[in-house]
């Protein structure tokens, strides 16, 4: 029996005894950051490039929001969403131990653990990327505060106070297709939303 699979870099019918492994989700073909690009499911390559540019241009500098609709990660015992896990690689920092905050600085947070040892957790301080962007973390805890292991210590400009990836603003939009071809589509937004963007 033939199954549709990926063989020699092409999607084609494959005999079942030739299959070496199976992916749980089609999104597993792409990495964490590639899955953030809008229009990734498009069958036309140029649309994928448009989407990556659109995302870069659409990111607000301040007051970003986590998505209203999030996808849970299969098999995650804590019930975290894709955006929760992505936030961990977007500059947010968590406490490795329970203890008391001794010091919060611009580049690290120091914790006196319940084990009596000091733990220094580095955070990003205007860390520059190569394309006119940077990542900056800001502590969400204060000196003298008690923290538990796994509690968020610092958020970044790409996450919210809970450490969830927050890249944009939630909006109700209208999609206006061009002659039904879905190639030169337009997106209509409200005046109120336009004011929120500025």
Predicted regions and their residues:
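Long, charge-dense accessory insertions within large macromolecular proteins
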Residues: 1-138, 148-198
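Metal-assisted phosphate- and nucleotidyl-transfer catalytic regions
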Residues: 141
């Amino acid at each position: 029996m033939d199954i549709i699979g990926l063989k020699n870099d092409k999607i084609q019918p494959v005999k079942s005894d030739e299959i070496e492994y199976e992916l749980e989700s089609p999104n597993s073909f792409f990495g964490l950051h590639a899955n953030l690009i809008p229009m990734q499911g498009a069958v036309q390559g140029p649309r994928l490039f448009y989407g990556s540019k659109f995302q870069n241009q659409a990111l607000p500098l301040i007051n970003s929001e986590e998505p209203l609709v999030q996808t849970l990660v299969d098999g995650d015992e804590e019930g975290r969403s894709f955006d929760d896990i992505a936030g961990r690689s977007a500059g947010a920092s968590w406490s490795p131990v329970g203890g008391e905050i001794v010091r919060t600085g611009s580049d690290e947070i120091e914790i006196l653990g319940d084990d009596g040892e000091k733990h220094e957790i580095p955070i990003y301080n205007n860390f520059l990327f190569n394309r006119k962007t940077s990542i900056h973390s800001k502590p969400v805890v204060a000196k003298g505060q008690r923290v538990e292991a796994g509690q968020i210590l610092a958020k970044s400009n790409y996450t919210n106070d809970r450490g969830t990836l927050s890249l944009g603003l939630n909006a109700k939009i209208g999609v206006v297709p061009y002659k039904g071809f879905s190639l030169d589509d337009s997106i209509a937004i409200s005046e109120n939303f336009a004011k929120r963007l500025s």
